[in-house]
Regions:
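Iron-sulfur-cluster electron-transfer modules
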Residues: 1-113, 359, 390, 421
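Ferredoxin-type iron-sulfur electron-transfer modules in oxidoreductases and energy-metabolism complexes
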Residues: 2, 10, 19-24, 46-47, ...
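Hydrophobic alpha-helical positions that pack around
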Residues: 2, 59-185, 197-199
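Gly-rich Lys/Arg/Thr-decorated short loops/hinges at beta-loop-alpha junctions or inter-strand turns
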Residues: 8-20, 123-128, 170-175, 379
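Short amphipathic, charge-patterned alpha-helical segments
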Residues: 34-38, 185-201
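Terminal amphipathic helices with adjacent charged low-complexity linkers/tails
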Residues: 46-66, 86-88, 200-233, 329, ...
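C-terminal accessory/binding modules appended to enzymatic or scaffolding proteins
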Residues: 163-177, 183-185, 345-393, 397
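Short pre-active-site segment immediately N-terminal to redox-active cysteine/selenocysteine motifs
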Residues: 267-270, 361, 391, 401
Length: 421
């Protein structure tokens, strides 16, 4: 019959996300057995695990597990005496974020540059080497053996109407207990952050869901349930399952700039909306964080973001503006503070801050003197120190080590830089 392929997408490239890698490293057989089941279901005879080369331990364990399956007759010709034959190979990717998109991933396996293609035809009709191809991620395939073993009724006990089952998340950021978690779909963000993650040490500010192209949600969404429709209604996405928690020390504008810088660099450059649009958004964000923003920039950001979402070729471009659009929607005041007041409330944007020692609070412990890389802080022990602003590179080292700032509040404080005429 017609050659069919099954591909396991293990190209996990979100910053701070490590769900797929951990599953493969800890239980590669669950994923491979899921591929075997899926291959049998669709009539495929060849399976490929596409995984980035930066995961050497996961790759090693996959190879060992594949070898063990062959030893037990679970791979190869006529598996267990049946007429079903199936082989699994590993394809190591070069780490391009865009290759997580299915058509770009297929191009990479074929030895081409990883660039998305317009659809239709969809991979299920014409995919790898123009043959019918089904692509699933690690978590989906790893769940199949348990569903078959326990039955669909067991699986649908978890979750909520329309979103059954569980989801693995990577919970990172300013959280007391970071790590991998598995929760039922429909669990609230409040339960995830405060009950499971232990909350944050300082005041909670926001949570980023869905990785670099996800949305940034404010405190008002803590009781939002984590499911596909609810996140989409708030302007975010589920994505691969990355959750980044932020506190009051996070600058929302700088955060949006960080994620746009990532997606702009990872863009394949094929379509104009993504290639040019993300660059223009990044340039505007850089101006704002440098204290050179204009009131019209906010409208420009929204217009560009909406245009990119509508015109980009693939999911990377269509979701790239999400961090900007959601922060504009829920944290507009921080943008206005950067533009109108030349103030960064989180004291992150260097051109908008200025360090100084408060003499009344300084005990002369010299902690700041020892960590200052430029010698900008001087003074004898047990006496208030001096800070030479001309030497200060605003690295925050002094601010971070000052015990008295942390306890009393402002042994070393940051004030808004004077607006230049």
């Amino acid at each position: 019959g017609e050659q069919k392929y099954l591909i396991c997408n293990a190209d996990e490239g979100d910053p701070g996300a490590f769900m797929n890698r951990s599953l493969i490293e800890s239980d590669p057989h669950a994923v491979l057995e899921g591929m075997l089941i899926a291959g049998y279901a669709i009539g495929a005879s060849k399976g490929i695990v596409y995984i980035r080369a930066e995961y050497p331990l996961a790759i090693d364990r996959l190879k060992r597990a594949i070898g063990q399956m062959r030893e037990y007759g679970l791979l190869g010709k006529n598996i267990l005496g049946s007429d079903f034959s199936f082989e699994i190979k590993i394809k190591e990717g070069a780490g391009a974020f865009v290759c997580g998109e299915e058509t770009a991933l297929i191009g990479s396996i074929e030895g081409k540059r990883g660039m998305p293609k317009s659809r239709p035809p969809f991979p299920a009709i014409s995919g790898l080497f123009q043959s019918p191809t089904i692509i699933n991620n690690v978590e989906t395939l790893g769940t199949l053996p348990n569903i078959l073993r326990n039955g669909p009724d067991w699986y649908t006990r978890f979750g909520k109407e329309g979103n059954r089952g569980t989801k693995t998340f990577s919970l990172v950021g300013k959280i007391r207990r970071p790590g991998l978690i598995e929760v039922q779909l429909g669990t609230t963000l409040r339960e995830i952050i405060f009950d499971i993650g232990g909350g944050v040490q300082k005041n909670f500010k926001a949570i980023q869901t869905g990785g670099p192209s996800g949305g940034c949600l404010s405190e008002e969404f803590l009781d939002l349930t984590v499911d596909y429709e609810s996140l989409a209604s708030a302007g975010s996405i589920m994505g691969s399952g990355g959750l980044i928690v932020m506190d009051e020390d996070t600058c929302i504008v700088d955060l949006a700039k960080y994620f746009l810088d990532f997606t702009q660099k990872e863009s394949c450059g094929k379509c104009v909306p993504c290639r040019v649009g993300t660059r223009h958004i990044l340039e505007i964000l850089e101006r704002i964080t440098n204290g050179e923003g204009q009131p019209d920039d906010l409208l420009a950001l929204r217009t560009l973001g909406d245009t990119i979402k509508k015109g980009a070729l693939c999911g990377l471009g269509q979701t790239a503006p999400n961090p900007v659009l959601t922060t504009l929607r829920y944290f507009r005041n921080e943008y206005l503070e950067h533009i109108k007041d030349h103030r960064c409330r989180a004291t992150v944007c260097k051109p908008l801050i200025e360090y100084r020692v408060i003499k009344e609070k300084c005990t002369g412990c010299q902690s700041c003197v020892r960590v200052c890389p430029t010698g900008a802080i001087t003074g004898p022990r047990s006496e208030p120190h001096n800070l030479d602003a001309s030497k200060c590179i605003k690295c925050r080292s002094c601010y971070e080590v000052c015990r008295y700032e942390a306890i009393a509040g402002d042994a070393i404080v940051i004030r808004t830089a004077e607006r230049q005429s």
